Structure formats: C-alpha cells, structure tokens
Amino acid sequence: MLKIYDVESARRGLLKRNPPDETQVPPVMLDRIAATFGERIGPEEAVKRILRDIRARGDLALREWSQRLDNFPTDAPLRVPAAELDAALAALPQPEREALEVAAQRIREFYRRQPLSSWFTNDLGGTLGQFIRPLKRVGLYVPAGTAPLPSTVLMSAVPAQVAGVKDVVVVAPPRSSPGSGTGHGSTGQISPVILAACALVGVREVYAMGGAQAIGALAYGTESVPAVDKIFGPGNLFVTLAKRQVFGAVGIDGLAGPTETMVIADEHARPAWVAADLLAQAEHDVLASAILLTPSRKLAEAVQVEVGRQMETLPRADILAQSLPGQSGIIITRDLDEAAELNNLYAPEHLCLAVADPWALSEKINNAGGIFMGEHSFEVLGDYVAGPSHVMPTGGSARFASPLNVWDFVHIISLIALNPATTAEIAPLAARIARAEGLEAHARSADFRSAKS
C-alpha cells in the first residue's frame, strides 16, 4: 500500500536523500563478502582488492574472481564467439526481433538529430575552434540482475555508434545455471536476448563477465580484454563502487543508483493509468522509488486503491511489497506550482506530467533526467521505444547531470591557430598576466613573440 504524505512530512522523510557514501549494506551482503575474503570487510575494500588484483595479474585474476563470485567455469571463453551472437539473433522470436528493430531505429534517428560537429572562427585574428572527436573504444556494462535488459544494449550502443565510436564493447554477467541457487552465473553464457540485441545493432565484441572484475578489466585491460577509454552502464553496488574507484584511469558516464520516477498529476488524470506507471518503475528492484505529487486528494486516494488492486496480479509483487512502502508514496501538494518545486528539490530520473497542460507546467521544471508529457507519453515507452536513451541520471544527480547522449561518446580538442599580427598584439598581455602570477618563464616565452622582439 502506498502511504499518503503531507508536504512537510515528505520533506523530512520521503524526499530526503542520503549522501552517496551512506549506502546501507544488507547483512547478507556483508556475510557473503566475509565468506569470499575470509575476513569482515566492507564493499569498498572488497572492490579495491579485486581491482588491484585485476590490474596486477590480468586474465588470471579476472578468471579467478569470476569463478569465485559468479561460479564462472574456468574453461569457458571470456569473449563470446561471433557464431553465438549470430545464433542468438537467428533464434530470437520474430515479434521480439521486430520490437527491438523498431526501438533501435527510433533511437538512431533521435540521436542523428543531435547537433555534433566541429566548428571554427576566423574573427579573432587567425583560426580558433573545436575539433569534435569520437572516443576510440568504449565499454558498455549491461546488467543481468533480476532480469536481462536487451534495451540497455540498444540505449547505450546506438548513441555510441552515431557518435562515431570505432570499438563498442559490451560486458554482461553470465546466467545462473538451473539449480545453482547462487543468483549468479555458472553457465558461462550471457542471456541469449542480450546477445541477440548486440548482434542486432552490430556489436561484435562481447565478454561474459560482470561485477567489479568486469569494470577492472575494462579500465586496466588484460591479455584478453583490451582497455577502453570510457565505461558506461548501470550495475549493482559493486559495479558502482568499482566505477568510482577506476575513474581517472578511465572515464565513466556517472554513478547509477536505483531507478526512480515522479508523477505530477491533477484531477484530470486517470487513477488506473497513474497507478500503472508507478508500479512499472517500482517493480525494478526493492530500492526503486515511485512518487506521486498531486493537489487532488480524491485522485491520491483513488491511485492508492488502484495500486493495491493492480499489484495483486503482478508477478513481481514480492519486490513491490518492499519498494512501495520503502521509498515510494503519494504527496498531497497545495497546487501544481508546489509540486514542481518539490520535483526540482528531488531531481528525479523520470518525471511524468499527467496534467491538463503539461507544456505549461514543464516551464517550471529545472531538474529531471527526462520529462514525459501527458498520459500518452508514459515512461515505459521511454524505457524501450520512444527514442531518447533510458540511461538517465539518478540519485538527485539530475541537478547537474544529463541523460546519456552522443556528447558522452566524444571529446573536444581546442584549436588555436593565430596569425603573426594577432600574436604580436596579445603576447604582451599574456606576459603581463604571467608575471602577475609569478611565472617568469611563461612571460619570457610570450616576450619572444611580442611586437617589440
């Protein structure tokens, strides 16, 4: 059951975010770490040791950690053979293939329209500008978790390809074998639907590995896995901690947290639709967040009833039973303006505007990973087929971060090509600033090019 909050109590509890470093680690996870390492250590230290070992021993360490943590067969190939990719695509049922093809096409067409080009000007005494260059090699982490996510392959790989990245690499955890009881892979094989998605968009370099060890391999490289320039993709706590620790040696897209959605709805919204949208996000995992903001108590109570009714027939009700009372709820606001204010405070990954005039309300929104305008632009379409990538900032980072886009897969090189006259004119200014900073060698370098020399 979704709890109904007033604004003040929501500010004190539901809308209050914990700092990223205050992640609550379940006791079962600490027990597993202790069993693996033979001592009681936290996840940060565990990840640090794994990364250090991968960096020092390469493939040998990668295989050992994959076997210890994921029961990965010691004789299984790390890289998925091309024939296995093609076979997975050929075996994909036609309805699923058609859906993925349409999704890939829409994603590609969306990102082809994103401006991305070098530029130059001759108005400042020569030629100044910026070269836009694609990254050469990127690694995409595709989580398996509670379900395989072929959509994440499309939403990450296609923007990279549009940006011109030459080598797009996918890593994904192998599947659990029947009866393993581990929740982790022991077959040595990635879910076929993920492989099919890779083949569909032309990704040919795919590795069966997950967790911190996969991030370490991508960041530092091993004998079998060449290092990448930047790592993308969400994952569990260990993946997130690993990305944080390798940053600097390699680029990262960000630190993904549990998925979250916020719905602002007025009295015109349909309770059943609003409830369905909240449940769609809350079913992701037990830490997912789904919050409704509305000035209508009548709607709030109707949605509360609908959530309970629809939940009864959903197969992931066990997850919903934890995520709904945990980080989700309904907040009664004074009006839509206050709802927009609370949204900007929370900065959600997804914001759905189920109101009579979503365009007017969107003018008051500053912080959100993506805005879904009206009841017909519901968030699930954004998850799969609308066009923009579903990889969006979480944990309040929508205050300063953006959804995944082609700019994440390029870097900018500044160009300076001044003519002699301009150089002679501005070199004395550079020398003056350099001497003010106490950098005499800088100043003398400028003096050689000044008009007086």
Identify the meaning behind each predicted range.
Residues N344-S453:
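C-terminal core of ALDH-fold dehydrogenases
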Residues W119-N122, L140, V170-A172, E205-G211, ...:
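General beta-strand structural signal in soluble alpha/beta enzymes
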Residues L200-S289:
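Conserved NAD(P)+-binding/catalytic subdomain of aldehyde/semialdehyde dehydrogenases
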Residues A280, H284, L292-A368:
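A glycine- and small/hydrophobic-rich beta-loop-beta segment
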Residues M1-K136:
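N-terminal Rossmann-like NAD(P)+-binding subdomain of aldehyde/semialdehyde dehydrogenases
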